[in-house]
Amino acid sequence: MKAFYRLFYYISILLSCILAGVTIAGAFSGTASPDSFKFMPFIGLGLPILLLVNLASAVYWTIRWRCWVFIPLIAIFSNWGYINCVLQFPLLDPASKPTVKVNAYTPGVLTVATYNVDGFNREHTGYSCKEIAAQMRNLKADILCFQEFGIDDEFGVDSLCTALSDWPYHYIPSSPEGQHLLQLAVFSRYSIKKEHLIIYPNSGNCSLWCDIEVNGRMIRLFNNHLQTTEVSRNKRKLEKELRQDNSQRAKRAALTLADGLHENFRKRAVQANLINQLVSASPYPTLVCGDFNSLPSSYVYHTVKGDKLLDGFQTGGHGYMYTFKYFKHLLRIDYILHSPELKGLDYFSPDWEYSCLLYTSPSPRDKDVSRMPSSA
């Protein structure tokens, strides 16, 4: 029995070292292009789970009062950059609640919302759209960025614009002939002066930018819906094969899932590189919003953010930030980033059915672009 416990002890040390090594590698996934490092995006994708398992390992070694506790702790703290993107003080304040109450539209405050509305549930009555409009009205949002906007034949553009009439300025780009894009839209209380649709090769996803005049100053707003992961669809295929108890078909389905994920990692990387270039070329203070379909550990997040943008959650957020309602609320894939000229006052993600972020900041004035709010 003593030999068994000794073997278990050494295996535990080995597993802790392997786990820590993989987790430390995850700290570099944000700088590793999917083209050059095929497996790094997968490590970055699994980083939330890896960190939790390392935390459990640290607790285990602490209880056993062994020096090996430093192995998982080193792995955890090597990923402080990621942790800082999902945790902000005060930690116990829920990230789903605002800390700054905005009771009325205020000239000195700008609140921006990004919301993946999933086609408003494809309802013919427009109930979801009207409900979202009421929610945004209650939160005093100034600018709305929608992904997967979706227009129904029975509740068309005119009906949508009527439901969202509190935001009289809008940009709803149409898909070019022969293409079917996952539609984006921007609605604003402030005048939209210029706009442009960004189309990506071999993708149904897209981005847009528009120049908005706020209190006499221009800001450039990017609304993004980067390459969809298609995890849910491929996961259903894998589950179907597993239910049929056919190991070969299940293996093929798993490989197909991995190949599909990697291809989408590559597409998002190309899209992120383009957004980074466009942000660098912006002549105005910039807000970058939307559904990146990527974690803060990813190449996509680090590339879009670059050295010119700040994360609204890091400048104005609190608690534990997640935006994906599945996978036990572990994942943050939606963002609002901003130029240093803007300063976040609040950043929160309401606990609604679909991903929504709000960012609140002081609005840019004629000679003052120092701060800017966000709701997430």
Model segments located where?
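Hydrophobic alpha-helical segments, chiefly the membrane-spanning helices
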Residues: 370-376
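Transmembrane alpha-helices and immediately adjacent membrane-cytoplasm interface residues
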Residues: 53-55, 60-93
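Active-site metal-binding loops of divalent metal-dependent hydrolases
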Residues: 117, 149, 226, 291-292
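Membrane-embedded alpha-helical segments of integral membrane proteins
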Residues: 12-64
